[in-house]
């Protein structure tokens, strides 16, 4: 009989994974560790879709971890995430909890499930200078030439693509092929949402967030002294809203380009999860449209080795 050390709930943006994870955590009297590369930032609430109200289930507050741990402008990375995750994970295990890992950042999830040894890669000024004038498409071509990508973070800006190349060059000469942490035996639940429904939910949610004040949220962050280029670095909402605020895009252009970018992001998330399956991760897919109670019942049957 398998003995699971963790439950992982993953899925693309707008699949409803957080609502389900919180309900499952309430059922199991446990806590959630977030696996979202942007929800770690304070003040970046609407644009990252924190939806903290989801962590209140029938009046019960579900404890969550690795949300709101950094200030905007800081460039947090998977190396730091891995260390932060295991600190929280070990504490929860000592307290007798079965942790739930929930998120859509596949790189973070895979790094902790497999215990990869990751290096805190320093900047390479000479390499950065040599890449400075290349287009995003040219940088993506360079990235595609590497046999293994240690950092497949979303390269939707040239700055991120250059950082990814920097990491690959460093790993070519520095990285030992060993694990830093023991791999975790996790039950992995994937929330599957039909492509057209996903697109519909993404588009509807974008307009809701704009109505809720997402533009003002970005203005407020910029007013604290965070540089526009540092927000652009985070991509998606923060990239396009910043470009709108500094006058490089009209409102209509911003909404149109952002909507396309989020759809592309969701597709990349699914590509990563399928890649995880090819790399040996067994993912049990559950239909996003099922009622929460049915999702929980299915998960409990798998957890108890009945499926």
From Swiss-Prot:
Gene3D superfamilies: P-loop containing nucleotide triphosphate hydrolases
GO biological process: tRNA modification
Binding residues annotated for ATP, in chain numbering: 11-18
Ranges for region Interaction with substrate tRNA: 36-39, 159-163
Catalytic activity: adenosine(37) in tRNA + dimethylallyl diphosphate = N(6)-dimethylallyladenosine(37) in tRNA + diphosphate
One GO MF term attached to the UniProt entry: tRNA dimethylallyltransferase activity
Binding site for substrate: 13-18
Cofactor(s) needed for function: Mg(2+)
EC number annotated for this UniProt entry: 2.5.1.75
Any Pfam family hit: IPPT
Coiled coil: none
Domain of life: Bacteria
Database matches in PANTHER family: TRNA DIMETHYLALLYLTRANSFERASE
Job description of the protein: Catalyzes the transfer of a dimethylallyl group onto the adenine at position 37 in tRNAs that read codons beginning with uridine, leading to the formation of N6-(dimethylallyl)adenosine (i(6)A).
UniProt subunit comment: Monomer.
Record family assignment: Belongs to the IPP transferase family.
Protein name per UniProt: tRNA dimethylallyltransferase 1
Protein's gene: miaA1
């Amino acid at each position: 009989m398998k003995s699971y050390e963790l439950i992982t709930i993953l899925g693309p943006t707008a699949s409803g994974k957080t609502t389900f994870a919180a309900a499952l955590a309430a059922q199991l009297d446990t806590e959630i560790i977030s696996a979202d590369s942007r929800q770690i930032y304070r003040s970046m609430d609407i644009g990252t879709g924190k939806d903290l109200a989801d962590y209140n289930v029938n009046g019960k507050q579900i404890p969550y971890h690795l949300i709101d741990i950094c200030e905007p402008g800081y460039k947090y990375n998977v190396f730091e995430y891995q260390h932060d995750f295991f600190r929280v994970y070990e504490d929860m295990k000592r307290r007798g909890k079965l942790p739930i890992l929930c998120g859509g950042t596949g790189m973070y999830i895979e790094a902790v499930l497999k215990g990869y040894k990751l290096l805190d890669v320093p900047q390479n000024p000479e390499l950065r200078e040599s890449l400075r004038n290349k287009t995003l498409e040219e940088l993506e071509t360079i990235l595609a030439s590497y046999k293994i990508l240690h950092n497949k973070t979303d390269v939707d800006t040239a700055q991120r693509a250059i950082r990814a190349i920097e990491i690959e060059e460093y790993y070519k000469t520095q990285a030992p092929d060993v694990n830093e942490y023991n791999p975790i035996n996790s039950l992995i639940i994937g929330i599957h949402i039909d492509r057209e429904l996903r697109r519909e939910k993404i588009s509807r949610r974008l307009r809701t967030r704009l109505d809720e004040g997402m533009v003002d949220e970005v203005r407020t962050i910029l007013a604290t002294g965070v540089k526009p280029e540092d927000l652009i670095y985070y991509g998606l909402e923060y990239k396009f809203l910043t470009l709108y605020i500094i006058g490089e895009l009209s409102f209509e252009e911003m909404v149109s380009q952002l909507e396309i970018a989020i759809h592309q992001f969701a597709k990349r998330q699914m590509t990563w999860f399928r890649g995880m399956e090819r790399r040996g991760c067994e993912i049990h897919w559950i239909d996003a449209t099922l009622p929460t109670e049915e999702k929980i019942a299915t998960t409990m049957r798998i957890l108890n080795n009945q499926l």
